[in-house]
């Protein structure tokens, strides 16, 4: 049977991959956004696993809220990225500091 430790191990691996993705690839904004999504997915797995383990639904409801915030964050981030690419022709992180405003 799959226990709590299995879910926590998968979540720890996903969290580590997300953090490594941010630290290793600092040049591409898309990879950074995907790494942030991996981190949020790991948090959601932890919330749902502990919620099921404790028999409480609060963790699952909170995971649903985290999913909606993550979807909004991804949509806004990609929209900003598309506008930035149309204006600059590049999605390099070094060019982001040249934004006006």
Curated annotation (Swiss-Prot):
Keywords: Cell inner membrane, Cell membrane, Membrane, NAD, Quinone, Translocase, Transmembrane, Transmembrane helix, Transport, Ubiquinone. It is a multi-pass membrane protein. Its EC number is 7.1.1.-. GO terms for biological process: ATP synthesis coupled electron transport. InterPro entries: NADH_UbQ_OxRdtase_chain4L/K, NUOK/Mnh_C1-like. It is found in: Cell inner membrane. It catalyses: a quinone + NADH + 5 H(+)(in) = a quinol + NAD(+) + 4 H(+)(out). Its main location: membrane. One of its GO terms (molecular function) is NADH:ubiquinone reductase (non-electrogenic) activity. GO terms for cellular component: NADH dehydrogenase complex; plasma membrane. Coiled coil: none annotated. The keyword Cell membrane applies. It comes from the Bacteria. The chain crosses the membrane at residues 4-24, 29-49, 65-85. HAMAP family: NDH1_NuoK. NDH-1 is composed of 14 different subunits. Subunits NuoA, H, J, K, L, M, N constitute the membrane sector of the complex. NDH-1 shuttles electrons from NADH, via FMN and iron-sulfur (Fe-S) centers, to quinones in the respiratory chain. The immediate electron acceptor for the enzyme in this species is believed to be ubiquinone. Couples the redox reaction to proton translocation (for every two electrons transferred, four hydrogen ions are translocated across the cytoplasmic membrane), and thus conserves the redox energy in a proton gradient. Belongs to the complex I subunit 4L family. This is NADH-quinone oxidoreductase subunit K. It comes from Methylobacterium nodulans (strain LMG 21967 / CNCM I-2342 / ORS 2060). The gene is nuoK.
